[in-house]
């Protein structure tokens, strides 16, 4: 692995998905990532634009598939066989109090959404369709990787935000729009800092084909070795 990290990117074909720079991306993020791409070009990488047309459908599919898996996996969390427990006079109260106390708001939200998506009458309408979208997204990545070795793109359409600045679930979900397709497709990815906006970091993600984790790390490590963003520690609220 260490040998792989030091091989650089000269001659590698790096794809840039045009859909990851669509309307809604912060202009500062766009500039930072474009500068990172130029750094790769200067290091000998071959840069080419690619298309992942189903990117816009990934968010909706993910927030059906992920809550469904959450609901299914956490159904066993009862405080008896799994997890912490709050003892109560009755078994039912033990279940209810344990799950209420130890599940956070977002977990509860996902359990409810997932239970709904998997319920009778809605499985085909939601979960099955979401899995079909997932398959399409995975196939698009497979097709793109026939022409490039790896992808480079923004990690998020916005820079990191201050803790507590956002509490609305929808706006939080939208911050994941550029990493969710990678998760749905089951691909290795790594994020590295590529700039700061008002003291808050901007992320660059590297995406590689399945089982090519070493390649993703190699491309990311090459960028870190050529820049100093990863070594900066800007005080919050102070422009870097």
State each model region's role.
Residues 51-59:
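Short, surface-exposed recognition loops and adjoining beta-strand edges that mediate ligand/DNA contacts
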Residues 58-60, 164, 201:
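Short Asp/Glu-rich motifs
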Residues 9, 20-22, 54-55, 76-184, ...:
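Serine-dependent amide/ester hydrolase catalytic core
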Residues 64-68, 169-171, 207-209:
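Short, hinge-like loop/turn segments at secondary-structure boundaries
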Residues 59-73:
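Charged, often glycine-rich, active-site loop that binds/positions anionic groups
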Residues 1-26, 30-43, 108-139, 184-240:
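Structural helix-boundary/capping segments
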Residues 25-29, 61, 165-167:
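Short, solvent-exposed loop/turn segments at secondary-structure boundaries
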Residues 46-51, 190:
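General small-molecule cofactor/ligand-binding pocket signal
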